[in-house]
A protein has these predicted regions:
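Short hydrophobic alpha-helices and adjacent helix-cap/hinge residues
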Residues: 1-181
């Protein structure tokens, strides 16, 4: 999913050369997975990748100051709860940086990031419920097939794009499941 997410973002921000990730450090398995996948994808796309770890919300200012010194072009905000559930604390730093940003959840784009691309959480919860019903009905968990997400949500925050002077290509507008005004 990191490849698709970064590929869509690259189409929105074609001049991207240096991407910074804002996320918890030391990170959980989710943050480490996001970081490793982004590092790999950035290398494949020829981008420089920088990680700006935060232990707590009070570290955001320092992380963004470091990113300013490193002259990053854009930000990926981790889906970790530290950042994703505290977007009201993250967005002011993103806005002040005047850099495009993206994250893994629709709610992050709704909060002000330029875009998000993720599996549809509602669909995932529905599938989890169906699995639970099968298990409660007597099915052995080991006998159930592993399913991957099949429904994804691509959101573009048009208001943020305008504020950053980014013209969203018509091809991306056509792909977007949600356009936030």
């Amino acid at each position: 999913m990191a490849q698709k997410r970064l590929g869509l973002f690259k189409q929105l921000v074609p001049g991207l050369t240096r991407l910074g990730m804002i996320g918890p450090e030391p990170g959980s398995p989710l943050a480490a997975s996001e970081r490793d996948a982004l590092r790999k994808m950035c290398a494949q796309f020829g981008f420089d990748f920088r990680n700006y770890g935060v232990v707590g919300l009070d570290d955001l200012e320092g992380a963004f100051a470091s990113a300013r010194r490193d002259d990053v072009d854009a930000f990926f905000v981790s889906g970790e709860p530290l950042t994703s559930t505290n977007m009201s604390r993250v967005i002011p730093f993103i806005a002040t940086s005047e850099k495009p940003s993206f994250g893994p959840y629709l709610e992050m784009a709704q909060a002000g990031l330029l875009m998000s691309y993720s599996s549809d959480l509602s669909d995932g919860f529905r599938h989890a419920g169906l699995y639970a019903a099968k298990i409660l009905g007597g099915a052995k968990p080991g006998d159930l097939p592993i399913e991957q997400a099949s429904k994804f949500t691509f959101a573009i925050n048009i208001k943020t794009a305008r504020a950053l002077g980014i013209s969203v290509p018509p091809t991306l507008l056509a792909l977007a499941d949600e356009m936030i005004e």
